[in-house]
């Protein structure tokens, strides 16, 4: 039953001397694709299958395992900076928590494709005939040796080289349409051990030794080494196999397709994609495809047509009515004949086998029922042929033959392409900051926020900026805090603008990094007067001048298009910039010195703000020193008593205190420019909570673009936390945002706007439903590669949950 005779690189010889070349199809992301994008993938796969006019194709979907510990260890290598020790300790604790929750390994579906290499006809001459006869004789001798001694298998080097040349051509053809990787000896070893019931080994950690002895004209391998991965006790029952190893046993059952009773309409027929999400247990699938070339297929179809016509005539002569089955079959056969005749396409004999394994018989029965129900819903009827378990088991082995002809389905390339082979949901990176897990597949999601600017192959953006959008209470602040916290642990530096003063207790709740947390709380205390004056806070005088003009025009409502007032104000600000003592109070003095009706008017207007509530923070007389330092790893700037306007309030309706509040946000955000221009080798984050407050005013919008552009050059990401995607969806900003997080929203217009912001079909009802039905802590994530999926944010640690929770205490007690 063991079909493999010899393995060399990715080539496998079977006992019938057929040679298959095996590749791993690198999975492609399939979630949230539009119908058009799905059809593009479908066409590529159809062409991949149709390019082989003859031969066989073996497709395998195998549930392999990947090690959580090795991913976490790789993540530790990314940590730098002052908090390296704390970060590594945190990652170790995280690893232990994850392992205790989901085990050492997580299921990772891999897709393998084997193509039979067809020998090109050699020229018929005496030399080739002699060579062929000699090879046949040698083959006979080796077979005798093998039968008597059962010790080694030999393969002529000429034969190996000949097939390797053919494989190179094949690989070249395949890789034009899909990303593939040639299989290696370790892959074959893992595949065989997996099929014979071994698990608990991570795919990347597995090693398989197959020593070769290269002689002058041939290469030898020990037969024992070849079959070593299959060692286990197999006990065959009617409908399952029992696989016993030294330390454990498992039960395996095989299904095959009996009939497809309805139409499998694309794009909703992607069985390979949906079964990854449907089952909580691993399921393997094998497709053994034999290509029936066009002429042969047409002959078969025409013969079948004659049979059906005979049945029809027989019924007519007997005076009875032809059954509806025969009439339907005649219609289908006519359609198929026309189709094959016009397209000149091949037909495919498909043997489709599903492998289900479990640790005990009861669990196996439950899993088998679940698999059967899933396929039933897709109009595919499965059977477990009694007594054929070992034969169906052998179909999964590389280079194996079709075991049974009773369950063959005749299909076209369209059908095979529509099964979604290689489709999966991928999100984020393979290592980095653990943010949570994919809701659909359960796979861990890792992010590396600083990666965008590195120009990694496959990324669709090089923007470091990120957006967190969603209605109140969905979890956007929590997710944002978690990402900033881990970015700081991994060696980054951050400034958080905290207008609602929600992060003031972080020194107490995050004791391990308390020494690196700097909280700047700007109260309306008289001692803080002038601390937010543009001339005090900005290092660069030119930046201070432009910020001063922005703030004063914002407060007074003077437009740069106002030919009377704006030049007067501009002149006064320039005079202060050029003087030795700089401060906004001097601008008022300068305007009074001008002593014209317009300048006095502007001076009085500005002066009316100076003693209003906490406005004195903005006005200094030039003697105030900058007391805000951003040298720590995590800096939080809070301004007490800020009153932010409602989301829907227009600029004209802003009250005086709202105007002042927004102008302070603009000053602090501009101050972040200095922070961005610090050490370029360190990844920096400027986190703007309640970003909508200044994104909705012209000065704030200009500033946000400036921050984002400066950030890209200086390795700094600007994080916008806002309630509506419309705030960050303006073309100038939208194209400069990399990572996107969208939390629950119930307003249909907002949902459509968010989907459009993510670049996915906004009118697709399924997409709208996904966003509407998100639970707290779940978000739609778009990564740097443009892939979209639903993620459950997972803080792992209780203390982080409490530290970043922004719900009021009363509500929290109710929840508990």
Placement of each model-derived feature along the sequence:
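P-loop NTPase motor domains
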Residues: 35-53, 276-279, 292-299, 380-381, ...
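Short glycine-/polar-rich loops that comprise or flank the Walker A/P-loop
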Residues: 53-56, 109, 490-492, 517, ...
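Extended, folded cores of ATP/NTP-driven motor/assembly subunits in large transport
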Residues: 1-410, 420-421
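P-loop NTPase motor core of the ASCE superfamily
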Residues: 100-101, 540-586, 729-816
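Charge-patterned, long linear interaction tracts outside catalytic cores
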Residues: 125, 439-445, 450-452, 457-470, ...
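Conserved P-loop NTPase motor cores
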Residues: 312-314, 450-474, 478-484, 497-504, ...
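Switch/coupling segment of Walker-type NTPase motor domains
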Residues: 60-75, 81-82, 92, 102, ...
């Amino acid at each position: 039953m063991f079909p493999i005779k010899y393995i060399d690189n990715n080539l496998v010889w079977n006992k019938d001397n057929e040679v298959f070349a095996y590749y791993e199809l690198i999975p492609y992301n399939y979630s949230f694709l539009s119908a058009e994008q799905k059809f593009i993938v479908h066409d590529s796969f159809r062409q991949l299958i149709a390019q082989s006019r003859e031969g066989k194709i073996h497709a395998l979907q195998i549930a392999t395992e990947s090690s959580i510990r090795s991913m976490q260890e790789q993540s530790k290598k990314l940590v730098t900076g002052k908090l390296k020790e704390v970060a590594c300790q945190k990652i170790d604790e995280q690893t232990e928590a994850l392992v205790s929750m989901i085990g050492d390994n997580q299921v990772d579906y891999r897709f393998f494709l084997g193509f039979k290499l067809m020998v090109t006809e050699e020229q018929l001459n005496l030399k080739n005939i002699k060579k062929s006869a000699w090879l046949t004789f040698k083959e006979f001798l080796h077979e005798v040796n093998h039968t008597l001694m059962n010790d080694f298998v030999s393969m002529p080097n000429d034969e190996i080289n000949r097939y390797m040349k053919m494989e190179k051509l094949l690989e070249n053809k395949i890789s034009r349409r899909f990303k593939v990787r040639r299989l290696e000896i370790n892959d074959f070893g893992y595949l065989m051990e997996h099929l014979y019931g071994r698990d608990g080994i991570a795919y990347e950690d597995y090693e398989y030794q197959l020593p070769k002895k290269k002689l002058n004209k041939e290469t030898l391998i020990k037969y024992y080494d070849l079959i070593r991965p299959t060692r286990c006790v197999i006990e065959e029952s009617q409908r399952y196999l029992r696989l016993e190893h030294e330390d454990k046993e498992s039960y395996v059952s095989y299904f095959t397709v009996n009939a497809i009773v309805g139409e499998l309409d694309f794009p909703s027929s992607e069985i390979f994609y949906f079964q990854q999400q449907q089952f909580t247990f691993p399921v393997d699938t094998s497709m053994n495809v034999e290509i029936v070339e066009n002429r042969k297929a047409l002959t078969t179809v025409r013969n079948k047509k004659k049979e059906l016509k005979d049945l029809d005539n027989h019924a007519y002569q007997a005076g009875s009515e032809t059954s509806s089955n025969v009439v339907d079959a005649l219609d289908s056969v006519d359609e198929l004949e026309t189709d094959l005749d016009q397209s000149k396409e091949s037909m495919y004999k498909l043997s489709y086998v599903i492998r289900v394994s479990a640790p005990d018989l009861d669990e196996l029965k439950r899993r088998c029922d679940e698999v059967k129900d899933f396929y039933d819903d897709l109009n595919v009827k499965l059977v477990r042929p009694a007594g054929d378990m070992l034969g169906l088991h052998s179909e999964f082995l590389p280079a194996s033959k079709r075991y049974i002809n009773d369950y063959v389905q005749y299909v076209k390339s369209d059908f095979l392409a529509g099964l979604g082979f290689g489709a999966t949901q991928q999100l984020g990176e393979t290592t980095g900051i653990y943010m949570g897990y994919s809701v659909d597949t359960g796979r861990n999601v890792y992010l590396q926020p600083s990666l965008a600017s590195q120009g990694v192959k496959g990324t669709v953006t090089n923007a470091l900026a990120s957006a967190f959008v969603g209605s109140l209470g969905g979890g956007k602040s929590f997710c944002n805090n978690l990402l900033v916290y881990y970015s700081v642990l991994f060696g980054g530096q951050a400034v958080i603008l905290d207008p609602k003063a929600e992060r003031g207790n972080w020194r107490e709740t995050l004791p391990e990094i308390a020494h690196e947390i700097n909280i700047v709380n700007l109260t309306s205390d008289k001692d803080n007067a002038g601390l937010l004056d543009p001339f005090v806070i900005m290092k660069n005088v030119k930046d201070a001048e432009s910020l001063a003009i922005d703030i004063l025009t914002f407060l007074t409502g003077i437009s740069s298009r106002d030919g009377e007032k704006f030049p007067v104000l501009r002149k006064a600000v320039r005079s202060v910039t050029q003087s030795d003592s700089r401060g906004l109070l001097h601008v008022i003095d300068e305007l009074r010195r001008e002593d014209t009706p317009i300048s006095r008017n502007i001076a009085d207007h500005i002066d009316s703000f100076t003693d209003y509530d906490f406005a004195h923070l903005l006005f200094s007389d030039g003697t105030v020193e900058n007391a805000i330092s951003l040298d720590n790893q995590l800096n939080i700037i809070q301004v007490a008593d800020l009153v932010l306007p409602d989301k829907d309030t227009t600029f004209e309706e802003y009250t005086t205190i709202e105007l002042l509040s927004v102008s302070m946000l603009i000053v602090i955000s501009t101050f972040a420019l200095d922070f961005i221009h610090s050490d370029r080798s360190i990844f920096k984050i400027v986190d703007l909570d309640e970003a909508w407050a200044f994104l909705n005013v012209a000065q704030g919008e200009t500033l946000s673009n400036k921050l984002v552009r400066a950030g890209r050059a200086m390795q700094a990401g600007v994080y916008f936390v806002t309630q509506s995607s419309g705030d960050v969806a303006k073309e100038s900003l939208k194209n400069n945002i990399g990572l996107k997080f969208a939390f629950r929203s119930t307003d249909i217009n907002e949902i459509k706007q968010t989907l459009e912001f993510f670049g996915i079909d906004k009118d697709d009802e399924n997409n709208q439903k996904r966003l509407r039905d998100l639970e707290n802590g779940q978000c739609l994530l778009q990564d740097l590669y443009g892939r979209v999926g639903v993620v459950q944010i997972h803080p792992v640690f209780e203390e982080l949950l409490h530290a970043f929770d922004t719900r009021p205490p009363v509500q929290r007690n109710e929840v508990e």
